[in-house]
Structures are given as C-alpha cells and as structure tokens.
Amino acid sequence: MKKLFLIIGAPGSGKTTDASLIAKEDDKYAHFSTGDLLRAEVASGSELGKKIDSFISKGNLVPLEVVVNAIISAIKGSEKSNIIIDGYPRSVEQMTELDKVLSAQNEINLRGVIEVDVSEAIARERVLGRARGADDNNEVFNNRMKVYLDPIEAIRKFYKGKNLLHVVNGERTIEPIVADIKKLIENL
C-alpha cells in the first residue's frame, strides 16, 4: 500500500521546493509536482502537451481527467511507497475526482493534506521575484491567485472533515518549514 501526502498552498508558498527537499534528503520519499508533470508534457511537444500549454500559459486549470491520469500514473509507476504530490488539488472538482479514484482502489492511501500557508502579499513578492517562466507576471499571478483562492475554503473543509488537513506556516525560512512538514509526514 502506497502512502500519499498532498501539499497545497498559494503560488509562491514554497510547496514544490519543500516537497523536493524532503524527497532529496530522504530516499524513501518520491516527489511529484503536478506543475512539473504537466510542464514535462508541454516540453515533450506532444499534442497533449500543446493542449496543456494552452491552459497553463494563461494561468488556467488543465482539464481534470488529464491531471488525475498523470498523477495516478506517476504514483503507480513509482518504486517508492511514500509519495508526496504538491499543487493538487486546485479545485473542488479535482479534489472530488481524486477522492473518487482513491476510494475505488486499494493500492494508494491518502494519509495527509498539508497546506503551506502564506499571505497573498508574500506569495506575490516571491512569484514576481523569481521570474521562472512566462507565467510569472502580475496579470497571470492575479489569475493564479484567484484560481487558488476561489475553492480553498471548500478544499480545507473537505479534508478537515476527513481529519487529513494540517497547516504549516510558510512565512519562515525554508529549514523549519521543511522540518515541520517532514515531521508531520513521518507521523501520519
């Protein structure tokens, strides 16, 4: 049985960096970023990649079935039994679909959802300061923030109701954030 941990947070919250550091420091964890999974598909130049790019380049969500298939395939294909995925779910529909898919099988057990909590001001400062890609400009950031904020209360409520939600303060230096997340994951 594979253990699944989801790390969610605003754009610029550090969720991808946190998750990748945990996986790098401890090889019993595999880390997948939904953003990286989707960007890899775009980079491949495939038809699916072009379709994904038409959504990502505007800061919009990629269609549900594409994302869920990419995630489940990555989990099942991993040699590791502890899987960390960041940046998912980003909508109530994604959350519901993942819950449905996980409920219908017995290979993957969702153990926890960790929210890396940062203010919008900190998120904006980090994203606009990193200039990682064409999606890191003010207009696209505003759209990405709206896409994140619109469903977050419903997502929190759903996972809190399942006793899976844990919140970590993301407005500190990276070491204590990573240590807190790792401690949570090890105890779930």
Swiss-Prot record:
Amino-acid positions noted as binding ATP in the UniProt annotation, renumbered to this chain: 12-17, 130, 172
One MF term in the entry's GO annotations: ATP binding
Catalytic activity entry: AMP + ATP = 2 ADP
Keywords in alphabetical order: ATP-binding, Cytoplasm, Kinase, Nucleotide biosynthesis, Nucleotide-binding, Transferase
Region (LID): 129-135
Cellular localization per UniProt: Cytoplasm
Location, primary (coarse class): cytoplasm
Sequence segments annotated as region (NMP): 33-62
Pathway: Purine metabolism; AMP biosynthesis via salvage pathway; AMP from ADP: step 1/1
Keyword Transferase annotated: yes
Record GO cellular component, one term: cytoplasm
One of the protein's GO biological processes: AMP salvage
SUPFAM superfamilies in UniProt: P-loop containing nucleoside triphosphate hydrolases
InterPro entries (alphabetical): Adenylat/UMP-CMP_kin (IPR000850), Adenylat_kinase_CS (IPR033690), P-loop_NTPase (IPR027417)
Pfam families in the cross-refs: ADK
Binding site for AMP: 34, 39, 60-62, 87-90, 94, 132, 144
EC number: 2.7.4.3
Domain of life of the organism encoding this protein: Bacteria
Record PANTHER family: NUCLEOTIDE KINASE (PTHR23359)
Family stated for the protein in its record: Belongs to the adenylate kinase family.
Assembly with partners or alone: Monomer.
UniProt function note: Catalyzes the reversible transfer of the terminal phosphate group between ATP and AMP. Plays an important role in cellular energy homeostasis and in adenine nucleotide metabolism.
Protein name: Adenylate kinase
